[in-house]
Amino acid sequence: MVCNLAIDAYYGCMADFSHILMTRPDFGDDDREWLHQLVADWQVIADLSFADLLLILQNGEGKYIIAEQCRPSTVMSLRAEDVVGNVVPESLCAELDAAMDSESLFRSSKLRTVGKAKVCNVYAPVRHNGKT
């Protein structure tokens, strides 16, 4: 997923994946461990897709938070800054809602220009124990 987001800092401090996961009261230890395993193995996906990957979760307040980020090593990343812990802007929430409800990949209908590149957000909802 490639996003160019203007975002607010999450709690005004350096975000930590484990801390962000704790904002989900419905996530048990098994859910958190599964997500840690997921992001531990996703570098190869970023490399093969030539794309920045962002793991976006809804926190306990219903806001979408960037919980983890992976940059490809096969191409230059379009995202120079670390966005982990940032709140996703309202302008992308409708797309995220649709992606969370979908049963497969969800591709944005809007192309954006980032630098000299045209990018399209592609969302891949991940589910574990009935949670997205």
Residue ranges of each PLM-predicted region?
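Cytosolic beta-strand hydrophobic patch enriched in CBS
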Residues: 55-56, 124-126
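A short beta-strand signature within small-molecule sensing/ligand-binding domains used
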Residues: 106, 115-125
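Short hydrophobic/glycine-rich mini-motifs in sensory/regulatory modules
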Residues: 126-132
